[in-house]
Amino acid sequence: MAALLVRSVVASVVDPFLHLSRLAVKPRVFSSFLLGTLPRAKPCAEVRSVLCGRPLPTLLPSLGFKTKGVIKKRCKDCYKVKRRGRWFILCKTNPKHKQRQM
């Protein structure tokens, strides 16, 4: 109880001095002192076995637009769309064909 009181008093005294300038950053000594030690939870055996038992699914990266000065249709399924004042090439069969005009 006394430690909590000391922490709150130190925090209230030190805090105004740290906000005097925009570039002031709280020193790690004060922040670690004010936070104290946080209890660490250990995962139980059931959770550990579930996580280790099967591999996590991998996510496929989404493809972005290629930004070009001159855009071209690269296959018969590519089509042009004008959005936000720019021309875009979109393709349903091959997403690698997506292009954006500079």
UniProtKB/Swiss-Prot annotation:
InterPro entries, A to Z: Mitoribosomal_bL36m, Ribosomal_bL36, Ribosomal_bL36_sp
Listed GO CC annotations: mitochondrial inner membrane; mitochondrial large ribosomal subunit; mitochondrion; nuclear body
Molecular function GO terms recorded: structural constituent of ribosome
One of the protein's GO biological processes: mitochondrial translation
Subcellular location: Mitochondrion
Keywords: Mitochondrion, Ribonucleoprotein, Ribosomal protein, Transit peptide
Cytoplasm found in the keyword field: no
Main subcellular localisation: mitochondrion
Subunit annotation: Component of the mitochondrial ribosome large subunit (39S) which comprises a 16S rRNA and about 50 distinct proteins.
Protein family per UniProt: Belongs to the bacterial ribosomal protein bL36 family.
The protein's name in its UniProt record: Large ribosomal subunit protein bL36m
Lineage: Eukaryota, Metazoa, Chordata, Craniata, Vertebrata
